[in-house]
């Protein structure tokens, strides 16, 4: 299989076929992020022949076990949804060619990736099986989004995710607890809940901000430009987010960065 560097996937994609179609991140400017520092370039697309070779390899392995029932494929890379719709549709066709039982295709997406697609293209992608995208919105706090160089504003989250709603593409959010900084976390949580309450995420996964010495954010802290939240502040922030969410959604803070695992179905309606 053509995997480049560390392979990242959401916990709920554990049983999906992991197919690399991109490597690295087109944005690669978020101050807190070091996920793709182990690859020697910013971003590249996988050649279609590599993608097909990987599908052939998986099919061959499955044949040995008399099992080729792939039902979901997760495209590997920081933001494969940035690819042109024509290429994403080609990838979907290849998956269907080798695994006709495949029902849906997921991937990581930036908010800005959705903005690159027309309504017609989003509808085509929906029909081709693209669904349950994972979007690292991180927060609805505009000050934090700007400081961390996320490349979009909170209003863009609403605009682009409503476009997904309109064509029937579901989506999940990643929230980054602690991204607002000390003294600002609970307000950031309220801002995020306000955004989420206007949308229809299927899952909200919360991770605790972890600051690595090789990150740009670490340098900002050393310069006195930003102060991190205490662990108690982070859990108060998380509590505030849950308190203000008013939509039916699966909420989970169960990754390795969360000292206290939390998961529950929030059965609420606006």
Residue ranges and their predicted role:
Residues 270:
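Conserved small/polar residues in nucleotide/adenosyl-binding loops
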Residues 41, 141-147, 216, 260-262:
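A short acidic, helix-capping loop that chelates divalent metal ions and anchors anionic groups
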Residues 43-50, 83, 87, 148-156, ...:
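Alpha-helix N-cap and loop-to-helix initiation/capping positions
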Residues 132, 155-217, 232-255:
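Conserved C-terminal portion of the radical SAM core fold
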Residues 80-83, 111-115, 179-184, 212, ...:
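Short, small-residue-enriched loops and turns at beta-alpha junctions
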Residues 59-166, 170:
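Conserved SAM/AdoMet-binding glycine-rich loop
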Residues 6-53, 57:
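Canonical Radical SAM [4Fe-4S] cluster-binding loop centered on the CxxxCxxC motif
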Residues 25, 33, 51, 75, ...:
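Conserved, mostly hydrophobic/aromatic
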